[in-house]
């Protein structure tokens, strides 16, 4: 593909730094999806009970954000997350997908569909399953003190590409 000469403009180093800074700030500002406090790479909530305009969708994201996970670079259940993104327990991923499918009505339903497609089909970081060898679980909890995790592998092209390029 050839770019026409009239579409190319030389700019100064200062102008380039201005535009680079602007792009970086845009990325920081867009960490959560409009209408939500929890859907995205961060959260904007001041406390656990705060939800955005699309409260049903936001509730799904909030629950998912507080689910069992292994942050990038950390080890849990004998499994080290060497990827760029947080790795989630497969039970959490299943519950998150079902929650998003249950969000219907108005514009909130299509927004939940967008989150679901983006998260699972594009991002698709994969997840882990925990086996509890002793079959002994802590009282009133699903935690397994001697659990061992196995990774399912990336499910979406985006996560696969990012993890390969950064690894």
From Swiss-Prot:
Its cofactor is Ca(2+). It is an enzyme of class 3 (hydrolase). GO terms for molecular function: calcium channel regulator activity; metal ion binding; phospholipase A2 activity; toxin activity. Keywords: Calcium, Calcium channel impairing toxin, Disulfide bond, Glycoprotein, Hydrolase, Ion channel impairing toxin, Lipid degradation, Lipid metabolism, Metal-binding, Neurotoxin, Ryanodine-sensitive calcium-release channel impairing toxin, Secreted, Signal, Toxin, Zymogen. Residues 136-140 form a propeptide. Binds 1 Ca(2+) ion. It comes from the Eukaryota. Pfam families: Phospholip_A2_2 (PF05826). GO terms for biological process: arachidonate secretion; lipid catabolic process; phospholipid metabolic process. Its EC number is 3.1.1.4. PROSITE patterns: PA2_HIS. Belongs to the phospholipase A2 family. Group III subfamily. This is Phospholipase A2 imperatoxin-1. The lineage of its organism: Eukaryota, Metazoa, Ecdysozoa, Arthropoda, Chelicerata.
């Amino acid at each position: 593909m050839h770019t026409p000469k009239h579409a190319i403009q030389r700019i100064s180093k200062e102008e380039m730094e201005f535009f680079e800074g602007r792009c970086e700030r845009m990325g920081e500002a867009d960490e959560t999806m409009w209408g939500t406090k929890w859907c995205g790479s961060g959260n904007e909530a001041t406390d656990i009970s705060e939800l955005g305009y699309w409260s049903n969708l936001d509730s799904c994201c909030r629950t998912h954000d507080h689910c069992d996970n292994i942050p990038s670079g950390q080890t849990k259940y004998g499994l080290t997350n060497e990827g760029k993104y947080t790795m989630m327990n497969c039970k959490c991923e299943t519950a998150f997908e079902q929650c998003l499918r249950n969000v219907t009505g108005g514009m909130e339903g299509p927004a939940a569909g967008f989150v679901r497609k983006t998260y699972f089909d594009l991002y698709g970081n994969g997840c882990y399953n925990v086996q509890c060898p002793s079959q002994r679980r802590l009282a009133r909890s699903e935690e397994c003190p001697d659990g061992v995790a196995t990774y399912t592998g990336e499910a979406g092209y985006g996560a696969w590409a990012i993890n390969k390029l950064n690894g």
